[in-house]
Amino acid sequence: MKKLIALILAMVMSISMVACGGGEEETPKSTIDKILDKGYITVAISPDFAPSEFKDPISGEVLGTDVEYAKYVAQYISEKYGKTVELKIEEMDFKSCQAAVATGTVDFSVNGYAATAERQENYICAGPYAVVSAENDTYHGALVKKGLKIETAEDFKGLKIGAQQASLQYNLAMEQLPIDEMPEIELITTLPLGAIQVATDKIDALITDSGAAESIIHNNPELEMAAFKFEYSSEGNVALVNLNETELGALITEALVASGDVMDYDTLRNEMAQKAIEMGVEVLG
């Protein structure tokens, strides 16, 4: 009888343990854990702005300063966690890169982003990285046909300008130019196309930086940078991370800040600019 009771008690305890165990829920894995499990991290890049990001016209490989910083992020994560993490590049246009981050389609994006107030409201701005040295004298201004004088913001009245949507240059134009007295800004998908629109009188000016203009002017001698300069002080670039991914954002910030100890932006930019030129790719920044 005692054996029977003991057997029944054992069965009851066993059933109870199974029932309790079945009710437990596993803690969802963090994005970082998922990256470590997959062995790669995804980055959205628009490869149309050499030397920051461009494609080898023969192999199709995406290259550039931003690519090198993204690679360093993957390397940093690998070394920090002791697991191999590779970089997987997702190519798309500039606007789509930001949308991909917002929807969680990619882990992060690098495209020479500035930490604007709007971006800080909608994304984690990880970084900074690629901090420009004091000796670098590039500026943001307007690429125009020779003969068109633009010296002040007021000179833009009545002119049709172009800029990449959601870019720093677009925001500078919206903030510092008399937009209410100008035609609607022409949204440019790529800077090379914007330069063509200036050359063919589709727009009066392309809002860009002087570094981008150097190569464009070299290949299009009828163009020049206007005397006007936007007021802007660079504090480096940032990577965009989904606003809800605070842990991942902190990790990418950690990696990008650390990159400053092992990567010199000015040297890297010159190397990538030379590589782009050798490949016949127009250097735009």
Model-derived segments and spans:
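Bilobed "Venus flytrap"/periplasmic-binding protein-like clamshell domains
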Residues: I45, F49-A50, V62-E79, A114, ...
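Ligand-binding clefts/hinges and TM-proximal coupling segments of bilobed small-molecule sensing domains
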Residues: G22-T27, L36-D37, L168-E186, P221-F228, ...
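Extracytoplasmic small-molecule ligand-binding "clamshell" domains
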Residues: E25-V110
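A ligand-binding cleft/hinge motif common to bilobed small-molecule-binding domains
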Residues: S96, V110-N122, L172-L177, I196-T200, ...
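Extended ligand-binding regions for polar small-molecule ligands
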Residues: E25, Y72-Y76, K146-I150, G158-K160, ...
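Periplasmic-binding protein-like
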Residues: P47, A130-V144, S210, E214-L256, ...
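Acidic, polar ligand-binding/catalytic clefts
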Residues: K83-D155
